[in-house]
Amino acid sequence: MPNIEYYSVKKFNSIKQMMEMAVEDVADKIAFKYIENNESKEVTYKEFNEDTKYVGTALVNLNMHNNHVAVIGNNSYDWLTVYLTMLKTNGVLVPVDKELTKEDIINVLNNSDSEVLFYAEKFEQYIEEFKQKVPKIKYYIGFERAEDEDNVLSYAKFKKIGKESYEKGNKEYESIVPDTSKLRLLVYTSGTTGLAKGVMLSEKNLVADVYHGLEVSTVYDTCLSVLPYHHTYEAVAGILVALHHHATICINDNLKNVLKNIQLYKPEYIYLVPAFAEVFYKKVWSNAKSTGKDKILKIMIVVSNILRKIGIDLRKKLFKSIHEAFGDRLIKIVVGGAPVRKEIGKFFNSIGIDLINGYGITECSPLVSVNQDKFNDPSTVGLPLRCVQLKLDNITPEGEGEICVKGDNVMMGYYKNPEKTAEVLKDGWFNTGDYGKINSKGQLLITGRKKNLIVLENGKNVFPEEIEEYIMGIPYVQEVIVKGIKNDIGSETGLCAEVFLSEEKIQELDIKDPQTKIRKDITEATAKLPIYKRISEVQVRDKEFNKTTTNKIKR
């Protein structure tokens, strides 16, 4: 195990204390920047903390502050205000995926025992039906709604009433002492809601992840917040980490505008899933090739890496045009949620933008391991956090096993589902369902997902993610999944690659027969793999795969 130099992190026991520390230290610093109705907005740490007090006081007036409160909608300042408001109570925040079907939303609201729903305008059309099918909800509060009607309230008026009550001396919300051992965040895992489980996270879980994550990977003054807030990766590793660090959070308004907003806000760091890093990587090389500079770029990377070995770092100058494309201030991209291709990590590190790869899962709040700033190997997902014990279960002769985690970040269990909880939590160890290896330096390598495992009829086990990484190296492949080919009796006899190709890249590369070309290129890309891991069938899709809200392909 290497000697790791940990960052000094200011300790805190609760999210409420963390916010009080921020206001004490940087009251007038900008906490949030965002666009609303085509107008730029800025909110200081003091103003944000006051807004949470106003919303919290309004909830106290309804006697709902210790209850289950759901929120659904696009990433927004109002969404985050409700989020932090509830984290400072003894109630429970239920973030709901805005991409769920109406029926699935109803199931989540019922299963979570939510009694208040904060919602975006898109869901106004469902409120009357929710009233009939979600009997426990007592109040609906619309972010864009202008007027109150019975128990359907305007958020602006709701916050205003809370402010008036607070300023008249109602300090009940402010006097709450959170019990950090109790359920605070109830997050429903992605998937069909019939199978979705409510992951119970305590405040202690959240505090552990924020504190120990910052020990190994620091953040900087400005970030762009991109990923959906109902996912713990962004809600905890993105938002709470930034607030602890007193960073300015710039809220991305649309996934299609990420590069545009990087130019607008000029962030120093950003949290992403690998799909975004893949797009950025291919865009850089595509631009280089279209301008005839791809060979020069390759040479510059080699020269830069040689110079760095003798202590000369010219990356900011050598790759100035690339840095300018990313706002000219980007220092770090933190990638989680799925494995990232090794060559992408090495490329960004070579040009002077640190790509830090980590591993997390909702049930672990979510961070389990991450590459350290000073000990970064993008082919791994780094070392476990200091609050984490990690082991591999049922290890194969190749050294692979199921990743099991114990520590302060591990969930309390699944909400109202003791059977499923017992299946994955055994003697304090959480069985993740992910498989991996641990190298000689103690770093974790993810090899695949248990549920994706392909067992061939010859008894060989294949993790499709490994082969997909090779295929994604083909420049005009936009998306791929590898799956088993079943015979008449259901046995998996071989491997099929289902691919979606980039029409733009096909035209740019002047590929006349994409169907033939992709089969040839996949054969070449996987030639070094064992025979049983090679592709025997290729299917070309005419449209993209269906994806989750964090841009992961639904298998």
Regions found by a protein language model. Give the residues of each.
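Structural core segment of the AMP-binding/adenylate-forming
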Residues: 88-161, 503
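Conserved AMP-binding/adenylate-forming
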Residues: 41-42, 56-100, 270, 314-444, 450-453, 478
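Conserved AMP-binding A3 loop
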Residues: 42-46, 184-210
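AMP-binding/adenylate-forming catalytic core of the ANL superfamily
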Residues: 100, 407, 412-413, 435-531
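Conserved AMP-binding/adenylation subdomain of ANL enzymes
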Residues: 207-225, 229-320, 354
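AMP-binding/adenylate-forming catalytic domain of the ANL superfamily
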Residues: 143-144, 478-479, 490, 523-552
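Conserved pre-ATP/AMP-binding loop-to-beta segment of ANL
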Residues: 27-30, 142, 163-188, 195, ...
